[in-house]
UniProtKB/Swiss-Prot annotation:
KW Cell inner membrane (keyword) present: yes
Residues bound to ATP: 169-176
Family of the protein in this entry: Belongs to the ATPase alpha/beta chains family.
Organism: Psychromonas ingrahamii (strain DSM 17664 / CCUG 51855 / 37)
Biological role: Produces ATP from ADP in the presence of a proton gradient across the membrane. The alpha chain is a regulatory subunit.
Membrane topology: Peripheral membrane protein
Enzyme type, top EC level: translocase
Site (Required for activity): 373
UniProt keyword annotations, A-Z: ATP synthesis, ATP-binding, Cell inner membrane, Cell membrane, CF(1), Hydrogen ion transport, Ion transport, Membrane, Nucleotide-binding, Translocase, Transport
Identification of the protein by name: ATP synthase subunit alpha 2
GO molecular function: ADP binding; ATP binding; proton-transporting ATP synthase activity, rotational mechanism
Length: 513
C-alpha cells in the first residue's frame, strides 16, 4: 500500500485540531516528619487554616499550624503507614459533614459515617463543621421553654429554646442522666436531639443508645461518637460536627437540642494536639485559645428570627423561627468550679446546673444545688403554671438549708421554725425523681401546687413521693380532660387554681396512699 504524504499531513492536522490539553494545577507537599498523629509538611505554599490535606494512604489530615517553612497537620485516622518523603495534596476544602433528617435514629462518627451497622445514610447535603455564629440582628429573644422533665430543673433552673445551659459537677453525680432524660422528654415535643459523646468508653455510649431506643427517643436523635479509643483530633472535632448537624434544623425553622458530653474531654484532646504541635502552653498547660475553642462552639446555639430562616431557605420557609439549645457538660475535680475550663464555660453559657457529690450521696437525686444553680434567660421562657407555682420552692429550700444548719446548734426551736424545717424537708423530698421517668407539665404543676398550698402538711416525709404518685394517677384517670388541657397550654388562672384545689381536696378526702 502506497502512503500519500498529503493525506498523512491532513490526518495529523485533524488530530492536532481535536486534541485538548488538560492541565491540572495541584498544590503538593512532602511529609518531613510523622509522630503521634501529627504530620509536618513542606511545600504546601497556599494552604488554608483548617484545610483538608489528602494523604497517600487515602486518609486526610487537617492543617492547624501554618508556619514559615512548613504546615503542621493533625491526621484524622490511622497514621502508622505514613512515611517521611511521601507526597500529599491540598484539597482546597475544609472539613464537611453530612446533614439532614436522614441522620435521625443513627449513630455516626465525627465525620458523619454510620457506625451502627444499619447501612448507608441518605443525607440532604453537607455542611462545614466551622460556621460563623448568627449575628445579633439575626437572633430572637428566648421565650419558649425546653421541658427537661426534671421537676427540680423546670421549676428552679428553667431552660429556654436557644439557650446554653451548663451541667457541671464531679464524676458520677448524674450529669449524663439529666441530659439523657431531657432528650427522652422531647419525643413528643417536636424537638430534634443530637447527643455528642466525647472521650467516653464505648460500653457507656452503647448503654446510652440502648436506653434512648428503649424509651422511643432514638428515632428523633442523632448520636455522634468520638469514643476514648478515637484519636485526639476526632474527639476535638466531634462537638463542631454535631453542632453543624443541629444547625441544619435551626436554619430551616425547626427546634433542636444538642448535648455535649463532655467538653472537659474535648479541651484535654485539644491540649494534647496543641502540645504536639509545639504551641506555647498557658495555665494548666492549655493553649492560649482554649476559651475560643468553646466560645465559638457555644455561640452557635441560638434562637434565630423568622427573617433569618426565610433568607436562609430562600423563601421556602416563612414565619417560623428556629433554635438550637445547647446543654454542655463539664466535669470538675473535687468540686472545684474555679478551675480554668469550668470558669471559661460558666462565663460563656447562660447559666449552670451545679450537681454536688454531697447531695448525691445523701440520696437527693437529681443532686441539683439550688443555691448556686442559675438560669439567666430561662425565666422568661418558663410556662405560666410552672412559673407561678415554682416561686416559693427555691425560697423554701434556701430557708430550709439555712435553718437546718442553725438547728444543729439550737436545742429549743419555736413553732414557726419547726414548721419551716418540716416544709423544707418535704419540698426536698418532693424534688427527688427517678431516672428515665420525665414528668409532664401537668404532673409537675400538681406536685408543685400540693407543696406550695400546704397540702403536704399532714403527710409524713417518707410518704411524700407516694402521695405525689397517687395524686398524679388520680388526676390522670378522674380529671383526664383538665390534665390534657394543662399539658397543652401550660396556662394558670383563677379557674385553674380552683380546679387544682378541687382535685387535691377530693383526692385527700377519698384516696389513701
Amino acid at each position: 500500500m502506497q502512503l500519500n504524504s498529503t493525506e498523512i499531513s491532513d490526518l495529523i492536522k485533524q488530530r492536532i485540531g481535536k486534541f485538548e490539553a488538560v492541565s491540572e494545577a495541584r498544590n503538593e507537599g512532602t511529609i518531613v516528619s510523622v509522630s503521634d498523629g501529627i504530620v509536618r509538611i513542606n511545600g504546601l505554599a497556599e494552604c488554608m487554616q483548617g484545610e483538608m490535606i489528602e494523604l497517600p494512604n487515602g486518609g486526610f489530615a487537617m492543617a492547624l499550624n501554618l508556619e514559615r517553612d512548613s504546615v503542621g497537620a493533625v491526621v484524622m485516622g490511622p497514621f502508622r503507614d505514613l512515611r517521611e518523603g511521601q507526597k500529599v495534596k491540598s484539597t482546597g476544602r475544609i472539613l464537611e459533614v453530612p446533614v439532614g433528617k436522614g441522620l435521625l435514629g443513627r449513630v455516626v462518627n465525627t465525620l458523619g459515617a454510620p457506625i451502627d451497622g444499619k447501612g448507608p445514610i441518605e443525607n440532604d447535603g453537607y455542611s462545614p463543621i466551622e460556621v460563623i455564629a448568627p449575628g445579633v440582628i439575626d437572633r430572637k429573644s428566648v421565650d419558649q421553654p425546653v421541658q427537661t422533665g426534671w421537676k427540680s430543673i423546670d421549676s428552679m433552673v428553667p431552660i429556654g429554646r436557644g439557650q446554653r445551659e451548663l451541667i457541671i459537677g464531679d464524676r458520677q453525680v448524674g450529669k449524663t442522666a439529666i441530659a439523657i432524660d431531657a432528650i427522652i422528654n422531647q419525643k413528643h415535643t417536636g424537638l430534634f436531639s443530637i447527643y455528642v459523646a466525647i472521650g467516653q468508653k464505648a460500653s457507656t455510649i452503647a448503654n446510652v443508645v440502648n436506653k434512648l431506643e428503649e424509651h422511643g427517643a432514638l428515632e428523633n436523635t442523632i448520636v455522634v461518637v468520638a469514643s476514648a479509643s478515637e484519636t485526639a483530633a476526632l474527639q476535638y472535632l466531634a462537638p463542631y460536627a454535631g453542632c453543624s448537624m443541629g444547625e441544619y434544623f435551626r436554619d430551616r425553622g425547626e427546634d433542636a437540642l444538642i448535648v455535649y458530653d463532655d467538653l472537659s474531654k474535648q479541651a484535654v484532646a485539644y491540649r494534647q494536639i496543641s502540645l504536639l504541635l509545639k504551641r506555647p502552653p498557658g495555665r494548666e498547660a492549655y493553649p492560649g485559645d482554649v476559651f475560643y475553642l468553646h466560645s465559638r462552639l457555644l455561640e452557635r446555639a441560638s434562637r434565630v428570627s423568622a427573617a433569618y430562616v426565610e433568607a436562609f431557605t430562600k423563601g421556602a420557609v416563612k414565619g417560623k423561627t428556629g433554635s438550637l439549645t445547647a446543654l454542655p457538660i463539664i466535669e470538675t475535680q473535687g468540686g472545684d468550679v474555679s478551675a480554668f475550663v469550668p470558669t471559661n464555660v460558666i462565663s460563656i453559657t447562660d447559666g449552670q446546673i451545679f450537681l454536688t457529690t454531697e447531695l448525691f450521696n445523701s440520696g437527693i437525686r437529681p443532686a441539683v444545688d439550688p443555691g448556686i444553680s442559675v438560669s439567666r434567660v430561662g425565666g422568661s421562657a418558663q410556662c405560666k403554671v410552672i412559673k407561678k407555682l415554682a416561686g416559693g420552692i427555691r425560697t423554701a429550700l434556701a430557708q430550709y438549708r439555712e435553718l437546718a444548719a442553725f438547728a444543729q446548734f439550737a436545742s429549743d426551736l419555736d413553732e414557726t421554725t419547726r414548721k419551716q424545717l418540716d416544709h423544707g424537708k418535704k419540698v426536698t423530698e418532693l424534688m427527688k425523681q427517678k431516672q428515665y421517668a420525665p414528668m409532664s407539665v401537668a404532673e409537675q404543676a400538681l406536685s408543685l401546687f400540693s407543696a406550695e398550698k400546704g397540702y403536704l402538711t399532714d403527710v409524713d416525709v417518707e410518704k411524700v413521693l407516694d402521695f405525689e404518685s397517687s395524686l398524679i394517677s388520680y388526676a390522670k384517670t378522674e380529671h383526664a380532660e383538665f390534665y390534657a388541657q394543662l399539658n397543652e397550654t401550660g396556662d394558670y388562672s383563677k379557674e385553674i387554681e380552683g380546679q387544682f384545689h378541687a382535685i387535691l381536696e377530693t383526692f385527700k378526702a377519698t384516696q389513701t396512699w
